């Protein structure tokens, strides 16, 4: 069950839960896979992770893009593939939470691979629509 904090109108302070340390440890473990607040679990309560991977290309004088990628990523890794190519990859609970951030690398993304194909396909359709709308002749990343 989820509850929006902005809908709460009355809060009463009571004793702390005896499970606080256990719950805090569980949150700490889960945060290494959380981009935002969403957590997906299967019907047995086990974590359901999605893999996100994209490759960007930079020019000679664009190291600041790599620094930005490293600085802004909340989780995951950045791997240098060659002088101009870098790969970001992460296992997350919800790929869709990352899309606004990934969009900021449009026109630099060379390849992408999301285990959640629905999100990947929607991202590509959105790019195609944007390219058509602005008359940009660029291929959508594969």
Where are these regions (language model features)?
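Core beta-strand-centered patch of the WYL/Sm-like small regulatory domain
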Residues: 1-55
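Polybasic (Lys/Arg-rich)
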Residues: 32-142
